[in-house]
């Protein structure tokens, strides 16, 4: 049994409400919290930006990777591309595909979540056929047979929930239809296009189990179902179907934007929304120590209002153990309420256990990112 030691207390000069109405002499609020944004927290009011460091030594640091330039990601099989970020519960890769997959893929290690960063394709799987295109999540249950035939070249973010299954978040007070109605989730169809690919031709299935590949050969195409019933399926969700929670008086924590819940991590989606309009409300992400989680952000589209020099296809990685938050120009723009609407789209992965990054990721790292919070850095 675990019960936090909690006793709300005020000390010195502080605001009555988190993320709003800061003391004039200390406009930099820092949240130190436990269990993501669900545990006990303290809010400090600082005279200087908590990210105002002048030097940084050691391996623990904020990192940025340009996943547009990762080597070895152009492959005909998702199991041929390198791991980029990983722990025992989640595996993150990117994959570029321009030709039809010659074999079926099957992930026996866990559910696979594909986010289509670029392109369009026909997805064929045990459940039927559907088209996936830019902005789609395709959630593929563990051990499903599937393949892609690109209509346009694909750039895919892959997020494996190792030895576990994805679920939807509990929505609590706002109800089951908030953020997105489950009715917007699409499933594959046993349609004419699916039936047209029935064949007696030899077909291989590449199965990944314990990170190792086995190949099963059939004298026919195993995607030969004429129908199915049940409540397990591949599902598709586009970020444009997400209607974000918002408040004009309070900057909601990232957890309000949770899209899928994995074992040991969550996947959140940041989509365009109005910026807080109340004069006292914080209008950019707050400085925070998310001390129990590592944070990964994949930037998909738009103007990333809290970050400088970040483009689509890049990733920032903020491990637990230090404060992170908006860059100086973004913080100042928030104070001046320059923007009334965000137009960014990004995928966030918050992991309960520490992530490792691979050599393939390190090769595309911007080692100067740690100093991007310095006002002089362009």
Swiss-Prot record:
Enzymatic class: oxidoreductase
InterPro entries: HgmA_N (IPR046452), Homogentis_dOase (IPR005708), RmlC-like_jellyroll (IPR014710), RmlC_Cupin_sf (IPR011051)
Record keywords: Dioxygenase, Iron, Metal-binding, Oxidoreductase
GO MF entries: homogentisate 1,2-dioxygenase activity; metal ion binding
Cofactor names: Fe cation
Superkingdom, natural source: Bacteria
Entry's EC annotation: 1.13.-.-
Residues that hold Fe cation according to the record: 288, 294, 324
Disulfide bonds listed in the record: none
GO biological process: L-phenylalanine catabolic process; tyrosine metabolic process
One Pfam short name: HgmA_N
Protein family: Belongs to the homogentisate dioxygenase family.
Name the UniProt record assigns to this protein: Putative dioxygenase VC_1345
